[in-house]
């Protein structure tokens, strides 16, 4: 089994890269995010590999980090999610963004990925809400929110506030941290408008 490739980029295609390792070209299928960060032909590259072996083929999937590879494996535990859909999700959301979306039950965020409808997004959020932290860890903002909310799903005002702050240009982790700080001040009964206002105050400090 191949676990990692270290070589030179020979070609970048729409859904895969060819990595030359001592004269042998390996085709690795990657997410759009990973392909976009690889660089160009002739540049050095390292990919962490998930190897699929079937009777009629061997296919390699490549990832920029081991964390991304763990998410790829985890996503395919969800009914209706195969390798193609898992790559689409990882091409749309970074591991920290995906962790935040699952923690906040942000189905709309997950469904942004091509080929992921509302039902599949709901299954991803529901089936991975307890497994995801153990496999991949979480962004600090997600941890802060879980500490404030406990084990349950985030209420709609919390998810709306994080989404609104993200739409203003802040990262999902920054937004989640700010909303977690706002919750410390207001408690769980605050509406989204108040959480957004206090979140912006926190981010401006």
From Swiss-Prot:
InterPro entries registered for this protein in UniProt: DNA_helicase_Holl-junc_RuvA_I, Hlx-hairpin-Hlx_DNA-bd_motif, NA-bd_OB-fold, RuvA, RuvA_2-like, RuvA_C, RuvA_C_sf
Gene3D superfamilies: 5' to 3' exonuclease, C-terminal subdomain, DNA helicase RuvA subunit, C-terminal domain, Nucleic acid-binding proteins
Keyword DNA repair recorded: yes
Lineage start: Bacteria, Pseudomonadati, Pseudomonadota, Alphaproteobacteria, Hyphomicrobiales
Region ranges (Domain I): 1-64
One Gene Ontology term, aspect cellular component: Holliday junction helicase complex
Quaternary structure annotation from Swiss-Prot or TrEMBL: Homotetramer. Forms an RuvA(8)-RuvB(12)-Holliday junction (HJ) complex. HJ DNA is sandwiched between 2 RuvA tetramers; dsDNA enters through RuvA and exits via RuvB. An RuvB hexamer assembles on each DNA strand where it exits the tetramer. Each RuvB hexamer is contacted by two RuvA subunits (via domain III) on 2 adjacent RuvB subunits; this complex drives branch migration. In the full resolvosome a probable DNA-RuvA(4)-RuvB(12)-RuvC(2) complex forms which resolves the HJ.
Domain description: Has three domains with a flexible linker between the domains II and III and assumes an 'L' shape. Domain III is highly mobile and contacts RuvB.
NCBIfam families linked to this entry: ruvA
Chain positions covered by the region annotation Domain III: 153-205
Chain segments carrying region Domain II: 65-143
Region annotation (Flexible linker) ranges: 144-152
Pfam families linked to this entry: HHH_5, RuvA_C, RuvA_N
Name the record gives this protein: Holliday junction branch migration complex subunit RuvA
Family: Belongs to the RuvA family.
Protein keywords: Cytoplasm, DNA damage, DNA recombination, DNA repair, DNA-binding
Organism for this UniProt entry: Brucella canis (strain ATCC 23365 / NCTC 10854 / RM-666)
GO molecular function, one term: four-way junction helicase activity
Primary localization: cytoplasm
Free-text function comment from the UniProt entry: The RuvA-RuvB-RuvC complex processes Holliday junction (HJ) DNA during genetic recombination and DNA repair, while the RuvA-RuvB complex plays an important role in the rescue of blocked DNA replication forks via replication fork reversal (RFR). RuvA specifically binds to HJ cruciform DNA, conferring on it an open structure. The RuvB hexamer acts as an ATP-dependent pump, pulling dsDNA into and through the RuvAB complex. HJ branch migration allows RuvC to scan DNA until it finds its consensus sequence, where it cleaves and resolves the cruciform DNA.
Keyword flag Secreted: no
GO biological process assignments: DNA recombination; DNA repair
Entry's localization field: Cytoplasm
